[in-house]
Amino acid sequence: MGGVIPCWKKGIFGMILHPPPLLILILKEQMSFTEKWDKAFDARDRDALAALLDDEFVFVRHQSGKEIPKEDMLNMWISDGPRVVLNNYRVIYENDDIVVTHRFVDFPSGDKEAVLGVINLKNGKGIRMETGATPMPS
């Protein structure tokens, strides 16, 4: 039978240190939805992105209100072509139900926008993403 048995250690000034509770160890290894998303997006990792999205996921275009399904967005996000550059990216709010972000985006075309993004979450996965954008001077 293998396994790790926690033991006590003597710390500074000879104090006995107890091992951290297992829950603390587990929590330290969990990443937020945003951290997982950023890692997968930067790597163009289709499987990791797909795992973060519900099968019913839709992206709503702010210009037209048109809904784009999961597979079409995955194809767009992992394509080998030029990508948008995200500047001053920040998470405004994140919990188990919603992620709200803001960023300035430089598009390959030279256009620039300030973008507010919202991702609705269901069971830890993105179910709907929508953005609102304001054109910025170049």
Model segments located where?
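Short, low-complexity N-terminal intrinsically disordered segments enriched in polar/charged residues
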Residues: 8-51, 55, 138
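A beta-strand edge to alpha-helix "cap/lid" segment located at domain peripheries
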Residues: 22-23, 42, 60-64, 71-138
